[in-house]
UniProtKB/Swiss-Prot annotation:
Its main location: cytoplasm. This is UDP-N-acetylenolpyruvoylglucosamine reductase. The gene is murB. GO terms for biological process: cell division; cell wall organization; peptidoglycan biosynthetic process; regulation of cell shape. One of its GO terms (molecular function) is FAD binding. The keyword Transmembrane does not apply. Cell wall formation. It comes from Macrococcus caseolyticus (strain JCSC5402). Its cofactor is FAD. HAMAP family: MurB. Pfam families: FAD_binding_4, MurB_C. It catalyses: UDP-N-acetyl-alpha-D-muramate + NADP(+) = UDP-N-acetyl-3-O-(1-carboxyvinyl)-alpha-D-glucosamine + NADPH + H(+).
């Protein structure tokens, strides 16, 4: 079916200004790479998300969901079908010792609002550059904390297009994985169960973690964050460093000289450069240590 026909159907449920055709996705990724989306939409309600999914299902059109593009590499050929951005869904509500946040809200903002309401438990998330939906999707974590520790439940869209609630156990959260990944569900919102705390102590902990992050991570360059999962008993960055790859460059991307676990875009690098670098790192580290590195970053889309 022609794209304009799909767009006409989408316009019945979603405002025209929130629908784009042949949209460059590098505008929305932390790596500043990626090709174009056939159709890119930005729903402003859960009902609009459901409507878009129904249209895609009826027309057998593939759908890809994007949060804030922090831990993802979109290939240079872009993404076919409909890309649904959840970044217009940013509502955050505080009720007692709990916070409920829509999928597109920044997890950093949720941690700050928790602090402002004297609630402890989300300090670890004060520097995670991801959306709430992405954080649940991959059970995001840092400095000893993870989403699994604090999430009470999430509202998700299942395969039938129904909105259902999954509690902590049903989410099957584990190291950088969840039932959301396995079943390709869509997170609409998440509720976090926190505890009362002292605002000065909370801020102090956040300051410590922020200083640690800024001193160790190459925040001055575009990157996708941690590229590789942590191998049991090892650290990916140390293995890469031991393989003499720190500072190594392919095309416009480089293994960060500040933290070897990061690949930074130093000179208009492409997604192909990122993929080539990842493959080179995996091959070299395996030859050097016998350890196979697995990617943490999601790689999606079509090659050129």
């Amino acid at each position: 079916m022609e794209l304009h026909t799909i767009v006409d159907q989408l316009k019945k449920s979603i405002q025209s200004e929130h629908i784009k055709i042949n949209e460059p996705l590098k505008k929305y990724t932390y790596t500043k790479t990626g090709g174009n989306a056939d159709i890119y939409i930005m729903p402003t309600s859960y009902t609009e998300v459901q409507a878009a999914l129904n249209i895609a299902r009826q027309n057998d059109i593939p759908v890809t969901f994007l949060g804030n593009g922090s831990n993802i590499i979109i290939r240079d050929g872009g993404i076919r079908g409909i890309v649904i951005s959840l970044l217009n869904l940013t509502k955050i509500r505080v009720h007692g010792h709990s916070i409920t946040a829509s999928s597109g809200a920044a997890i950093i903002d949720v941690s700050r609002i928790a602090r402002d309401h004297h609630l402890t438990g989300l300090e670890f998330a004060c520097g995670i550059p991801g959306s709430v939906g992405g954080a649940v999707f991959m059970n995001a974590g840092a400095y000893g904390g993870e989403i699994k520790d604090v999430i009470d439940h999430a509202l998700v869209i299942n395969h039938e297009g129904e909105i259902i609630s999954l509690d902590n156990q049903a989410l099957e959260l584990d190291y950088r994985t969840s039932i959301i990944q396995k079943e390709h569900f869509v997170v609409l919102e998440a509720s976090f169960k926190l505890a009362p705390g002292d605002i000065q102590s909370i801020q102090s902990q956040m300051d410590i973690l922020t200083e640690r992050r800024e001193s160790k991570q190459p925040l001055e360059y575009p990157s996708c964050g941690s590229v590789f999962r942590r191998p049991p008993g090892h650290f990916a960055g140390k293995l890469i460093q031991d393989a003499q790859l720190q500072g190594h460059t392919i095309g416009g991307v480089q293994v960060s000289e500040k933290h070897a676990g990061f690949i930074v875009n130093v000179n208009e690098g492409t997604a192909t450069d990122y993929e080539n670098m990842i493959a080179h790192i995996q091959e070299t580290v395996y030859k050097n240590s016998g350890i196979a590195l697995e990617t943490e970053v999601r790689i999606i889309g079509e090659p050129l």
